[in-house]
Design a protein with these regions (language model features):
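Auxiliary Fe-S-binding modules of radical SAM enzymes
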Residues: 2-9, 184-288
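Canonical Radical SAM [4Fe-4S] cluster-binding loop centered on the CxxxCxxC motif
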Residues: 4-44
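Hydrophobic faces of well-ordered beta-strands that scaffold small-molecule active sites
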Residues: 13-15, 63, 93-99, 123-125, ...
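Conserved, mostly hydrophobic/aromatic
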Residues: 21, 29, 45, 65, ...
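Aromatic/hydrophobic pocket-lining residues that form the small-molecule binding cavity
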Residues: 45, 78, 108, 147, ...
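Conserved SAM/AdoMet-binding glycine-rich loop
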Residues: 53-157, 236-237
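Conserved strand-turn element in the central/C-terminal portion of the radical SAM core barrel
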Residues: 102, 130-134, 154-178, 197-203, ...
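Catalytic cores of alpha/beta
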Residues: 110-112, 170-188
Length: 288
């Protein structure tokens, strides 16, 4: 199976707790097409940890729990996984995980705090959009309010919240509302990190079929910059590191907000005013 991980977990020990995604219903996502979700046995996970620890007990500093939704793992057994990681890796600094909003909602704040005490320091959660109608259309499986509650719950437990949104997810017709409502939901969550990706169609997904049958029209590169600009312009954070450096994006950026908000908005505006597409990543270089 293909391994999916955030770019920031490139040097982490990748430890699968589940196979596939517990929701696996988003219309745009092809990561787990045809994969039946299952939770791995605790004893198999501990064997994986022991196998790596035999040679790397002192050098593993970061661990990333995968696949698509490791936080759904049963609390008692997840606690045992965390304890075993701490026993076997002497210099462990951080454990991270993917989390769906639903799995974050299932855990109580006290349960999340227990995981935080054991080293779960960051959770990566897909927000995608703040447009309630679009959340239904893409079959996200949660509402605007549930996503906000999930993000806030992670932060309340002391776990760093790193969320992703998808430029162009509403297509041309829904672009303006998607951007404005996404800025709103990001403001309401006030995450520590935001990663913006740009929509890329995956054959076999419902969204791809919508595109083929003319029900969905992709935005242009410059339209994606307008969305990016509006999201940054209309969202407010206590302190957030905002990136759009994923390989799907046309304009790679990394910026600390709110400190450099005006600077990054000017950069995007200059490209839009001058229609400087030469500064944008070419289609052939974009990948998921």
């Amino acid at each position: 199976m293909t391994v999916y991980r955030p770019p920031s977990e490139a040097n982490s020990f990748l430890l699968p707790l589940t196979i596939g995604c517990s929701h696996n219903g988003c219309t745009f996502c092809g990561n787990y097409l045809g994969v039946n979700f299952r939770i791995r046995r605790l004893e198999d996970i501990e064997k994986d940890i022991d196998s790596v620890a035999r040679n790397y007990s002192g050098s593993v500093r970061r661990v990333f729990l995968e696949n698509g939704d490791a936080l759904i793992y049963r609390q008692r057994e997840l606690v045992e996984v965390m304890k075993h990681l701490n026993r076997r890796f002497l210099n462990l600094e951080r454990v991270g995980t993917y989390a769906t909003p639903r799995s974050a909602l299932i855990k109580s704040v006290d349960e999340l705090r227990e995981l935080r005490r054991l080293g779960l320091k960051i959770a990566y959660m897909g927000v995608e959009t703040g447009d309630e109608e679009l959340l239904l259309k893409i079959n996200k499986g949660v509402t605007y309010d549930q996503i906000v509650e999930a993000g806030r719950k992670l932060k309340q437990a002391g776990i760093t919240a790193s969320v992703t949104v998808i430029l162009g997810l509403g297509g041309v017709e829904g672009s303006e509302k998607h951007a404005s409502q996404t800025a709103k939901i990001l403001t309401d969550i006030d995450p520590d990190f935001v990663g913006a990706l740009t929509i890329m169609l995956v054959p076999g997904t419902p969204l791809y079929r919508d595109y083929q049958e003319k029900r969905f029209k992709l935005i242009s590169p410059l339209q994606s910059l307008i969305e990016l600009k509006n999201i940054i312009q209309d969202s407010n954070y206590t302190s957030c590191f905002f990136t759009a450096n994923h390989a799907s994006n046309y304009l790679p950026i990394k910026v600390r907000l709110p400190e450099r908000k005006e600077e990054i908005l000017k950069l995007i505006d200059d490209i839009l005013v001058n229609k400087e597409t030469s500064q944008l990543r070419s289609e052939s270089m974009r990948v998921l």
